[in-house]
Amino acid sequence: MREKDYDYLGIIFKNHSSHLIYAKIFKEIFVVSYEKQNKVNHIEIKRQKGQIWLQLKDNPDTLAFNNTAIYFLGIGKELVDTTKPIRYEIYIHLSIEDEFCKEYCYLLPIVYNNGTIMYGTKKEISIKEMNKIYKDPKLLIEHFVN
């Protein structure tokens, strides 16, 4: 696998306890907060410019940035070679405008330029679907909130 095969169009994270989904799609970060009240999802979506770094929970020395993140974390090959769902516990470091935060999340699907990957969830998500999410981030709720 060449390094460029690890480039992705989108990468999605979910924090169960704070009801947040983070999605880095193309060059934008989406922060989607959701809360279910009386069987109705209340959704707030922020679309922001920013950067994202990844850090494996079990290895605080691993810190990687944007497109090289999966490659440098050493899990890229495993993602490409497997079809079984795996969950990595991960911290994401966000730099949005002048704010910086660190969130504990599960790593959800990564959509690569070379095709569809099923990862961390039972649903497959394609490049076409990731483009739809970019246009309408509410679809993140449909895909990843039970």
Residue ranges and their predicted role:
Residues M1-N146:
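Amphipathic alpha-helical "stem/stalk" segments
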